Swiss-Prot record:
Coiled coil: none annotated. Signal peptide: none annotated. This is GTP cyclohydrolase 1. It is an enzyme of class 3 (hydrolase). Belongs to the GTP cyclohydrolase I family. One of its GO terms (biological process) is one-carbon metabolic process. InterPro entries: GTP-CH-I_C/QueF, GTP-CH-I_N, GTP_CycHdrlase_I, GTP_CycHdrlase_I_CS, GTP_CycHdrlase_I_dom. It comes from the Bacteria. Homomer. GO terms for cellular component: cytoplasm. Its EC number is 3.5.4.16. It comes from Corynebacterium aurimucosum (strain ATCC 700975 / DSM 44827 / CIP 107346 / CN-1) (Corynebacterium nigricans). Keywords: GTP-binding, Hydrolase, Metal-binding, Nucleotide-binding, One-carbon metabolism, Zinc.
Amino acid sequence: MSDNIPAQREFDHERAEAAVRELLIAVGEDPDREGLRETPARVARAYAEVFAGLHQDPTEVLHKTFAEEHQELVLVRDIPIYSTCEHHLVPFYGTAHIGYIPGTDGHVTGLSKLARLADMYAKRPQVQERLTSQIADALVEVLHAQSVIVVIECEHLCMAMRGIRKPGATTTTSAVRGGFKKNAASRAEVMSLIRS
C-alpha cells in the first residue's frame, strides 16, 4: 500500500506513560497529585486505541469480498470519523462518504468494511487530505474498484480551540479515482447523492 508511513513498531505503553508524565511536568503540573496520578497510564491506554490504525493493513480490512456481479455504485454516507491532527495532536472529527464502482469481476466488500477502512486510516496521526486519499487508494489497490469517490467533512479542534479560534468551521476534502475522475457527469451524480 502507498501509505507513506515508516515501518511499524508496536505501541510502547511504558514510554508513552513516561512521556505524558514529562508533559505534565513541562506545563507546570504535579503528576503525583491525586487527580493526575493515573493520568499517564490512562492517556497511554487511550493513545493505544486512538492510534491503533498504525498497526493495521487495509488488505486485512477489505480481504472478504462477495461475488455479486454488481457493476453499479455502492455508496455509504455519513460515516462518523474521529482522527488526530498530526501537527498539534488534537482531534478532528466529522463524516466520511465513500462510494465505489466494483472492479470488472463484480466483487463487492461488506458495507461495514468501508466504515472500518475509514476508521483504520483515521486512527493514526493524520491530516485530512492524506486520510481522504488513503481511503480512495486502498479501494483501488485492494478491491480493484473501477471508480472511487471519497468526501470527508471535518471540524478541526486545532482551528477551534487554539490559533485562529474558529469553532464550527469545517474542512471538506475529496479524492476521486478512475471513472469518476474522468467523467464529470458521473462525478456530479455521485456528489448529488452524497448531498441528498
